[in-house]
């Protein structure tokens, strides 16, 4: 239970892949213009993370260290291809919207990083939990950033949700306020870069306030031992 809690805190907050490790910034900045795009890419990344961590953990004792990275990349590429085919079949509109960023999941440093740093050194269950919480942490940042950009840029929320969830999801669209024209800065990558900066700053402020409320532990003074004669 303690290990699961540690993995959860690391993935969601303490070692969040987007806000702390600053990994996967390319899709984070390019795709998070709407909640739908952000959620779609986040779910795809989460599935690949869990699948790659589990697979790498299973084969870690059979893969020579000299070729482990190419093997890990092949595993990740196979899983990304499966996710891409599923999205092409069941969420074609979203598949077209995300475009090249779906196959680019293969090169995402989060996935290869967790495979090398954690999954290749741990059993299946911890590896799966690590992949899940890291993927959920990345998805959370994508959705929050996508929400902010969509509201500021278009004044809407969950626009195009039917691309991910089907026709019924059209009712989820919310018009927060009306824009005569879109605020392009929020919808383009520079706006995403600014948004990520604000999210990182907000996390830093919260961490500092949390640390300030913690009781300070007084360190015992250590008396130096004289080792030379005067």
Curated annotation (Swiss-Prot):
Keyword terms, alphabetized: Cell inner membrane, Cell membrane, Electron transport, Membrane, Translocase, Transmembrane, Transmembrane helix, Transport
Keyword Membrane: yes
One Pfam assignment: Rnf-Nqr
Gene Ontology biological process terms from the UniProt entry: electron transport chain
GO cellular component, one term: plasma membrane
Subcellular location: Cell inner membrane
InterPro entries: NqrDE/RnfAE, RnfE
PANTHER family in the cross-refs: ELECTRON TRANSPORT COMPLEX PROTEIN RNFE, ION-TRANSLOCATING OXIDOREDUCTASE COMPLEX SUBUNIT E
NCBIfam families registered for this protein in UniProt: PRK12405.1, rnfE
Protein name per its UniProtKB record: Ion-translocating oxidoreductase complex subunit E
Organism: Vibrio cholerae serotype O1 (strain ATCC 39315 / El Tor Inaba N16961)
């Amino acid at each position: 239970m303690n290990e699961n809690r540690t993995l959860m805190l690391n993935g969601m907050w303490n070692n969040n892949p987007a806000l702390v490790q600053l990994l996967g910034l390319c899709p984070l900045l390019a795709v998070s213009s709407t909640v739908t795009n952000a959620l779609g890419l986040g779910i795809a990344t989460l599935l690949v993370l869990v699948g790659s961590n589990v697979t790498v953990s299973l084969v870690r004792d059979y893969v020579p260290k000299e070729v482990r990275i190419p093997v890990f990349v092949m595993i990740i590429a196979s899983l990304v291809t499966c996710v891409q085919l599923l999205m092409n079949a069941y969420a074609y509109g979203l598949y077209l919207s995300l475009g090249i960023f779906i196959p680019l999941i293969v090169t995402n440093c989060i996935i290869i990083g967790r495979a090398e740093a954690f999954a290749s050194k741990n059993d299946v269950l911890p590896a799966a939990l690590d992949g899940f919480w890291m993927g959920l942490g990345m998805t959370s940042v994508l959705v929050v950033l996508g929400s902010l950009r969509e509201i500021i840029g278009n004044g809407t929320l969950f626009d195009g949700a039917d691309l991910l969830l089907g026709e019924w999801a059209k009712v989820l669209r919310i018009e927060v306020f009306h824009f005569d024209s879109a605020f392009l800065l929020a919808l383009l990558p520079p706006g995403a870069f600014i948004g990520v900066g604000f999210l990182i700053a907000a996390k830093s402020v919260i961490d500092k306030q949390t640390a300030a409320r913690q009781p300070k532990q007084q360190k015992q003074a250590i008396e130096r031992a004289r080792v030379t004669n005067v």
